[in-house]
Swiss-Prot record:
InterPro entries reported in the protein's UniProt record: DUF2179 (IPR019264), DUF5698 (IPR044035), UPF0316 (IPR022930)
Keywords: Cell membrane, Membrane, Transmembrane, Transmembrane helix
Cell location: Cell membrane
Organism this protein belongs to: Alkaliphilus metalliredigens (strain QYMF)
Homology family: Belongs to the UPF0316 family.
Name this protein carries in UniProt: UPF0316 protein Amet_0954
UniProt-listed CDD domains: YitT_C_like_1
Organism domain of life: Bacteria
Membrane-traversing stretches: 3-23, 38-58, 61-81
């Protein structure tokens, strides 16, 4: 029983510390120093405890296998947590084929700020819609776009920071 509890400890510790590491890296990229430092502190303690348990019985290959499995699962869990947190801002660029101003009105009515840029494509004048939004509102943007033009061309990029502009609260349905 003690052996199984040891395996479980190693696995859970690795899932926890690697998951925290993934979230910590996102905090670093987003410039959230204090949160990244706090997560890193706890993460390193958990890591030392897990590796210490493995090194106690390095001749036990199951310890190493459980350690590696916990690492892999921790990456998965960390990405899942980061997706659920949906931190930060993004910029969506949208090109649609028809009724551009109707789409602009729909997006603005839904609470999104929209800037329209006119350009020239292969078939003539095209309109590019720039929409700056919080990442957590991306699915709401997709819902509005799908109801208007499910064939719209959309690119989404991360924005390190956004300053100024027109922002309202995205309206809930």
């Amino acid at each position: 029983m003690e052996l199984v509890l040891g395996y479980l400890f190693i696995f859970v510790a690795r899932v926890t510390d690697v998951g925290m590491g993934t979230v910590r890296m996102i905090m670093v990229v987003k410039g959230k120093r204090i949160q990244a430092a706090a997560i890193g502190f706890v993460e390193s303690i958990i890591y030392i405890l897990a590796i210490g348990k493995v090194l106690e019985a390095l001749d036990n290959p199951v310890n190493i296998l459980v350690y590696a499995t916990g690492f892999a699962a921790g990456n998965y869990v960390g990405i899942y947590i980061e997706e659920r947190m949906a931190l930060g801002n993004i910029i969506a660029q949208v090109m649609c084929d028809h009724n551009v101003m109707q789409l602009v009105d729909l997006l603005r009515d839904a609470g999104f700020g929209v800037t329209v840029v006119e350009g020239y494509g292969r078939t003539g004048i095209r309109h590019l819609l720039n929409v700056s939004l919080q990442r957590k509102n991306l699915s709401k943007l997709y819902n509005v776009l799908d109801t208007h033009d499910h064939k719209a061309f959309i690119t989404v990029t991360d924005a390190r920071s956004i300053r100024g502009g027109y922002f309202t609260s995205v309206k809930k349905k």
